């Protein structure tokens, strides 16, 4: 070596510090390395590469893995060098365990000693690393440096080779640490499982299904209360240190302290020599928090071995037995220790050589490690995260977890007559408030409102509006239910036009009184409807938009069919009660700025009139003679005025209030003081109310046009021209055929009028008196001699288009009148011939001896007319009766009943059966709707009028019974028929499953309190259940009639804690093996393989893991909703203009002018361009489950299944797929979680229900929802059953290991993590089939109060509610300076 001066003058400054490089390398690597360098001779690089393998083998044999021994992770291991490890093929070690017994003094027979053989499997692990050495460096090493430059190159080559070797050694060191950590994780079940199963309070009872149910409950409790405990401690205030200590102590206590190496303690504290009881492996952040919370012990060092003990196999069989805590090496050792010297106590010094030779001579060195004191245990704490960070590898203790959250939108709380808040002040009348939105808080504490607008991309999609999948599911069932409906499924066409005969034949000697399912549902409260005993009705309540029934196909096979419910009012009463409908009505008032014209006095007057048993029957005669003709009304103004004034003065009630045309004509012609001002004011208010309601409906619908049609007909049935008034005097039928494009059919008897060209065949136009004067004789002859039963012509006046008069008439008959009268009315047929004879065939009417001004009663003989006038308390003049008689000249002969059938609108036409796509109604032609008759009235009028119960609003059995004796007999024979919804009506006139108005609306009308709210409620009940209606209601914040359960899955980045007890794993370190992988001209690549083995030495689970803190929430916890138009692009409504309108309104993804990729119709997912940027993280997708508004709000205040019925069946006695399916889907059994009901949401929990077909991939025709569906795990049948089976097996496997069943040589049970545990830890909601409640409130005021400084808040405020977040992740909510944890 040259002098220092020479070195300084050379351009190789690094040589100044490497003067003793060779000696250092000899000491640090191996003496044989450089000795072997001298053996390499020759210039062939390949030959040199081959020979260098020998060198490398010598070098790697010197690897000591000292770094692992210097980690706290080694505390939990007994580390032994086992040079013969490569010869081991099937490693098993047996341990003998004697079970202690208790000696009893009560005479019981002593227990025999029981000894079991525990078999521990040895698992091999292979780690390897790669080293690449340059041929140029090797050649330089073989040369002899002579010049300073050569010497510098020589030193550089040595450095390069040594660096490559050191790189490989470091990789192997890290590989050993990673292997040990992986082994620990393989034996570390989650804390919430281990803590429950290790509790003898549960396990000593065995593992029956009752105990398993308790175990699952404890799983959930520990998961909720103890996950992420460091986050909870941060905001706990005082006592946080004790809380953290208790959680860590529970981890220490949960694992088994028993080990087959009992007494072995290779690591102790530096001061005091106290054994280290185990180690917590944590992340850097958790380590800092723990030391901050608990403080570090003064003794922050532990003493550990600096080398490995040697494991030597001696004898043919190596048997290590543990008996009474003593370690034996062989059976001879067993005999010497237990038999020969039973009193001699074992010690660590004497026991340890039984396992590892030379352990007592191991040198010990201090190791820097954090130590915390938990009770009487000293426990080391270490983070290995830096090693993984340096190598850019994921740290095993950092995990991604997915938690599902759910919250309700639009629940209705019946009778909300109280509040738990004294701070909130809302509207003047808060008792009728109806929630339409849910306020939630995203992860960045931004307050967001989830309302109907957010859900339109789901609610307006065709998949929600089709029953096809539901029907396929039902028809695929083994057999339909026993009870099949036969009544009111289809309209039956009569072969004649005599309505009186139809009614007589139907009720004459009728004994059977079937009740439809729709009517049966109306009579049940929500609790009874959802009860398991009501399964027969509940099983067909699968879809909120359809009534499902059992019909027959052409082959007389029973098939399920579905008809659209059309309107919100047709929802079953248990799922949409009357109070809810009235609350919707109030929302409708507010949203449309409806100012009622009528007041309560008018409503009460109308109601008094309807229930007036002395209502003058003569008024019906007057109304029949006028029958909607304005000309005839003008002719009879004096008589009409007399009727109104007399009735008003006598009783304070309104005449003719049952007829829209009469009210319209009264308002138009009697405003000149012809009648009482008070009475006229009431008529005007009634008519004004109709106009106000019509204008409110127009504001609701808006002015949009879809194609050539107003959007109003898609929004509200009252605005749909295809719905006709219940009575007709003018030719509204031909007008319907002209304006409707929905294939209307006018069924007249057994004839069908469907083309305006056939109008002369079916319509007999009746003009005014002057026009018809020449036909009076012909009309008379027809009335006397015509075959009226088989004459299918309708005598109607010409249709007069008066703007929105048709809508006003429908509002009157379908809203105002049934609401104010409680539907206490019935259709009334008129025998015009007999009425004419009663009026005209008397002396004063046609004799010239009487003047017009004479009182007719003074000159009238006894007869029907006199009786009518007397019971009506009316004294008309002779002229009035003559004018009324003259009105008969153009009257028809009888009242006719016509059936009108039309297609549903295109959004409600998705039923598979063509007949189910149509809706029907009966219209009385030249008929009336009347109030109840008194006994005296019926005796007088029985030959003039007859009852026609033809409509849900105009078929009250109590009223019909007063008009028709057969009806009265039928009702008396069947008392249940007194209910409006249950009353049987002739099938030629009524078929409930085909009607616009069905039992729920009839029940509401019959039972509502006549009021302004009821009028608004009935109006809102006519809003359709269609996409356009949902769009309109979303715009005005009106409740759509159904609630929603919103499900969202959020992803959490968690930092976990692993605890492992001391000596719980025995690690065997073998010898390395070097092989050449690749030899090139420029370099040689070597692989170093190292074998290791591990044995779990614990007598139970000796390690556990639990989430300690939330590192980050990766999703935004927001309100982004699944776009079904992108998920299911192939499904559409039958009209392209309608599709385009809906997509434009809901903001569905569109591809511009580009044609859709045909592959998307198969794959089901279009290329949706995401947002250009994100502010709150990855958008969490929300999905909608349609839910009844009567769902129990308490259900959403704890973790439950979003389906509405528990789906975790782990408590089965023996897992069987058929049993599991029964517990999940069989609603004849009670819900396992709520035994008093089958479900909280029949529209989602049953097979084939709407929720099931939306999110169960069994029904997919194109694809399942999106790239990710948070609902799929709760609905997909295969996945649901797989998770159930996995959880069942997991609980059984853990129970077998922890339930006191010792292992034997036959079972060889190992204490490892059961398959599926990681999924359970990371996705617990999928296994438990429950979602966690998210913080939400139906009003922002409740959120504000929740964030106030008060300790308590208001969970209920009249109709509003707040749901607290109950989830493993406890979020810190901060608005301004207000913080809530």
From Swiss-Prot:
One of its GO terms (molecular function) is structural molecule activity. Pfam families: Herpes_MCP. It comes from the Viruses. Keywords: Capsid protein, Host nucleus, T=16 icosahedral capsid protein, Virion. GO terms for cellular component: host cell nucleus; T=16 icosahedral viral capsid. It is found in: Virion; Host nucleus. Belongs to the herpesviridae major capsid protein family. Self-assembles to form an icosahedral capsid with a T=16 symmetry, about 200 nm in diameter, and consisting of 150 hexons and 12 pentons (total of 162 capsomers). Hexons form the edges and faces of the capsid and are each composed of six MCP molecules. In contrast, one penton is found at each of the 12 vertices. Eleven of the pentons are MCP pentamers, while the last vertex is occupied by the portal complex. This is Major capsid protein.
């Amino acid at each position: 070596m040259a002098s220092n001066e020479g070195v300084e003058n050379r351009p190789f400054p690094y040589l100044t510090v490497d003067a003793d490089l060779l000696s250092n390398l000899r000491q640090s690597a191996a003496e044989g390395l450089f000795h072997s360098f001298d053996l390499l001779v020759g210039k062939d690089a390949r030959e040199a590469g081959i020979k260098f393998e020998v060198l490398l083998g010598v070098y790697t044999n010197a690897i000591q893995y000292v770094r692992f021994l210097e980690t706290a992770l080694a505390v939990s291991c007994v580390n032994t060098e086992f040079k013969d490890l490569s010869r081991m093929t099937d490693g098993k070690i047996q341990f003998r365990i004697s079970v202690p017994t208790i000696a009893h003094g009560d005479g019981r027979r002593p227990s025999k000693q029981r000894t079991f053989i525990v078999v521990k499997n040895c698992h091999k692990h292979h780690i390897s690393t790669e080293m690449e050495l340059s041929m140029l460096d090797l050649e330089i090493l073989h040369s002899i440096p002579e010049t300073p430059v050569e010497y510098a190159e020589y030193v550089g080559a040595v450095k390069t080779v040594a660096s490559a070797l050191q790189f490989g050694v470091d990789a192997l060191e890290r590989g050993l640490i990673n292997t040990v950590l992986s082994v620990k994780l393989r034996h570390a079940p989650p804390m919430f499982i281990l803590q429950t199963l290790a509790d003898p309070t549960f396990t000593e009872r065995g593992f029956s299904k009752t105990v398993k149910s308790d175990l699952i409950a404890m799983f959930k409790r520990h998961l909720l209360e103890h996950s992420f405990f460091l986050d909870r401690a941060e905001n706990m205030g005082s006592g946080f240190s004790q809380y953290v200590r208790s959680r860590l102590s529970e981890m220490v206590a949960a694992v088994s302290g028993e080990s087959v190496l009992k007494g072995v303690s290779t690591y102790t504290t530096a001061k005091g020599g106290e054994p280290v009881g185990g180690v917590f492996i944590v992340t850097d952040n958790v380590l800092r928090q723990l030391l901050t919370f608990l403080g570090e012990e003064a003794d922050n060092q532990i003493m550990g071995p600096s080398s490995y003990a040697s494991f030597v196999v001696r004898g043919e069989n190596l048997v290590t037995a543990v008996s009474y805590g003593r370690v034996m090496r062989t059976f001879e050792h067993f005999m010497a220790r237990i038999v020969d010297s039973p009193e001699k106590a074992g010690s660590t010094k004497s026991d340890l050589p039984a396992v590892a030779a030379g352990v007592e001579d191991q040198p010990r060195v201090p190791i820097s490690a954090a130590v915390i004191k938990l009770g009487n245990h000293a426990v080391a704490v270490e983070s290995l995260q830096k090693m993984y960070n340096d190598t850019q590898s994921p740290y095993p203790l950092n995990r991604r977890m997915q938690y599902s959250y759910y919250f309700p939108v639009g629940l209705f709380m019946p009778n909300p007559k109280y509040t738990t808040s004294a701070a909130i002040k809302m509207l003047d009348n808060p008792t009728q408030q109806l929630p339409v939105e849910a306020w939630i808080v995203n992860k960045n504490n931004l307050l967001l409102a989830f309302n109907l607008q957010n859900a339109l991309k789901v609610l307006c999609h065709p998949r929600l509006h089709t029953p096809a999948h539901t029907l396929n599911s039902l028809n695929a069932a083994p057999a339909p239910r026993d009870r099949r409906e036969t009544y009111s499924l289809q309209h039956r066409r009569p072969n004649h036009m005599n309505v009186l005969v139809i009614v007589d034949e139907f009720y004459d000697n009728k004994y059977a009184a079937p009740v439809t399912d729709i009517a049966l549902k109306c009579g049940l409260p929500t609790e009874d409807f959802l009860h398991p005993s009501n399964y027969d009705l509940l099983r067909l309540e699968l879809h909120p938009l359809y009534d499902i029934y059992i019909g027959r196909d052409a082959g007389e096979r029973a098939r399920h069919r579905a008809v659209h419910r059309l309107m919100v009012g047709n929802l079953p009463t248990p799922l949409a009660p009357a109070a809810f409908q009235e609350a919707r009505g109030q929302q409708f008032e507010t949203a449309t700025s409806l100012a009622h014209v009528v007041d309560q006095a008018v409503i009460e007057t109308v109601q008094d009139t309807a229930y007036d048993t002395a209502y003058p029957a003569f008024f019906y005669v007057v109304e029949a003679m006028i029958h909607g003709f304005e000309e005839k009304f003008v002719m009879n103004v004096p008589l009409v005025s007399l009727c109104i004034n007399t009735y008003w003065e006598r009783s304070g009630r309104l005449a003719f209030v049952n007829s829209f045309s009469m009210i319209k004509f009264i308002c138009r012609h009697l405003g000149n003081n012809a009648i009482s001002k008070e009475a006229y004011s009431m008529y005007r208010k009634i008519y004004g109310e109709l106009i106000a309601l019509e204008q409110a409906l127009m504001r609701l619908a808006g002015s949009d046009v879809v194609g050539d049609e107003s959007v109003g007909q898609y929004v509200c049935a009252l605005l749909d021209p295809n719905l006709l008034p219940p009575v007709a005097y003018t030719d509204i039928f031909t007008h319907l055929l002209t304006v409707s494009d929905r294939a209307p059919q006018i069924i007249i008897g057994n004839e069908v009028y469907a083309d305006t060209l056939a109008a002369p065949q079916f319509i007999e136009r009746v003009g005014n008196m002057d026009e018809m004067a020449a036909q009076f004789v012909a009309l008379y002859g027809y009335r006397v001699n015509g075959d009226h039963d088989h004459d299918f012509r309708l005598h109607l006046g010409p249709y007069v288009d008066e703007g929105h008069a048709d809508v006003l008439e429908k509002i009157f008959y379908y809203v105002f009148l049934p609401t104010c009268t409680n539907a206490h009315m019935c259709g009334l047929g008129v025998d015009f011939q007999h009425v004419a004879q009663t009026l005209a065939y008397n002396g004063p009417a046609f004799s010239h001896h009487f003047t017009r001004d004479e009182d007719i009663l003074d000159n009238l003989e006894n007869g029907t007319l006199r009786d009518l006038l007397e019971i009506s308390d009316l004294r008309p003049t002779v002229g009035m009766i003559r004018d009324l008689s003259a009105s008969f000249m153009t009257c028809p002969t009888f009242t006719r009943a016509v059936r009108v059938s039309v297609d549903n609108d295109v959004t409600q036409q998705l039923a598979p059966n063509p007949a189910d796509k149509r809706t029907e109604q009966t219209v009385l032609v030249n008929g009336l709707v009347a109030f109840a008759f008194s006994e005296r009235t019926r005796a007088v009028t029985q030959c003039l009028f007859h009852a026609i119960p033809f409509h849900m609003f105009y078929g009250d059995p109590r009223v019909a019974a007063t008009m028709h004796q057969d009806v009265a007999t039928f009702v008396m024979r069947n008392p249940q028929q007194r209910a409006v919804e249950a009353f049987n009506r002739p099938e030629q006139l009524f078929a409930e499953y085909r009607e616009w108005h069905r039992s729920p609306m009839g029940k509401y009308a019959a039972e509502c309190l006549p009021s302004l709210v009821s009028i608004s409620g009935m109006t809102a009940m006519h809003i359709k259940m269609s996409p356009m209606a949902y769009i309109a209601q979303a715009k005005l914040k009106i409740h759509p009639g159904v609630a929603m359960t919103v499900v969202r899955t959020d992803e959490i980045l968690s930092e976990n804690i692993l605890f492992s007890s001391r000596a719980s794993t025995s690690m065997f370190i073998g010898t390395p093996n070097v092989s050449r992988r690749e030899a090139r001209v420029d370099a040689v690549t070597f692989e170093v393989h190292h074998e290791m083995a591990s044995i779990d030495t614990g007598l139970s689970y000796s390690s556990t893991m639990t989430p300690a803190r939330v590192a980050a929430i990766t999703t935004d916890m927001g309100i982004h909703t699944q776009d079904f138009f992108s998920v299911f692009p192939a499904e559409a409504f039958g009209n392209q203009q309608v599709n385009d309108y809906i997509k434009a309104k809901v903001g569905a993804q569109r591809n511009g002018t580009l044609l859709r990729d045909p592959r998307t119709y198969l794959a089901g997912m279009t290329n949706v361009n995401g947002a250009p940027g994100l502010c709150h993280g990855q958008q969490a997708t929300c999905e909608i489950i349609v839910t009844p508004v009567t769902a129990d709000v308490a259900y959403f205040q704890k973790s439950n299944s979003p389906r509405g019925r528990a789906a975790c069946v782990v408590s089965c006695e023996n897992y069987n797929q058929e049993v599991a399916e029964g517990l999940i889907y069989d609603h004849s059994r009670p819900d396992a979680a709520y035994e008093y009901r089958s479900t909280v949401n029949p529209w989602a929990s049953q097979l084939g229900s709407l929720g099931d077909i939306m999110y169960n991939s069994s029904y997919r025709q194109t694809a399942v929802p999106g790239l990710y569906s948070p609902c799929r795990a709760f609905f997909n049948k295969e996945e649901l059953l797989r998770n159930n089976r996995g959880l069942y097996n997991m609980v059984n496997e853990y129970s077998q290991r922890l339930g006191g069943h010792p292992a034997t040589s036959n079972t060889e049970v190992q204490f490892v993590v059961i398959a599926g545990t990681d999924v359970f830890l990371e996705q617990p909601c999928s296994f438990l089939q429950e979602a966690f409640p998210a913080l939400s409130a139906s009003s922002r005021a409740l959120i504000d109060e929740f964030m106030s400084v008060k300790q308590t808040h208001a969970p209920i405020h009249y109709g509003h509610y707040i749901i607290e977040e109950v989830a493993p992740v406890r979020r810190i909510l901060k608005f301004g300076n207000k913080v809530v944890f």
